[in-house]
Amino acid sequence: MTSQHRQPEQVAQHLRHSLGRLARTLRHHDDDDLSPTTASILFAVGREGPLTAGDIARRERLAKPSVTAAVEKLATAGLVERRADDSDGRVVWIAITPAGKRRIDARRARRTAWLTIRLEKLDPADVETLSRAADIVDRLIGEDDQP
């Protein structure tokens, strides 16, 4: 059966499997010791700017206690800092530090380099197909990924 004739459930299973393998492979080839949850939080704060723990929990779909524990690890490592809100002392903002930004940049560079090497071995038409597929995946997850 060709991919043109696969039912949505079959495509969903194949896509889930392939993207999961890609994510695991990228983690395996990365020497970073951050857990997936901690890395996700660091990337969110780096991407979105200062966030509260509640903001992070909603955006990353994590339990607030998990966010609190991960932020503590990131703060201890000097990758994020906590800042009190100027107008409401009860609110604590979590912001990325320069060391956190460097960590994100290095992680992205390593993973991009690994993937680029593999993409360069493919036929240009396959690279274009993967580019279009990535756009489709972005649209697919974007439907549910709104904060």
Where do the protein language model's features map onto the residues?
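N-terminal leader segment of winged-helix/HTH proteins
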Residues: M1-P36
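Short, locally clustered residues in the helix-turn-helix/winged-helix DNA-binding domain
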Residues: F43-R47, R108, D135
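Helical hydrophobic small-molecule/effector-binding pocket
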Residues: H29-D32, K101-A106, R139
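Short, structured helix-loop boundary elements
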Residues: P8-A12, R16, S35, K64, ...
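Charged, amphipathic alpha-helical coiled-coil/dimerization segments
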Residues: E72-R132
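Amphipathic alpha-helical dimerization/coiled-coil segments
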Residues: S3, Q10, L22, L26, ...
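N-terminal helix-turn-helix DNA-binding core of bacterial DNA-binding proteins
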Residues: T25-S66, K73, A77, W93
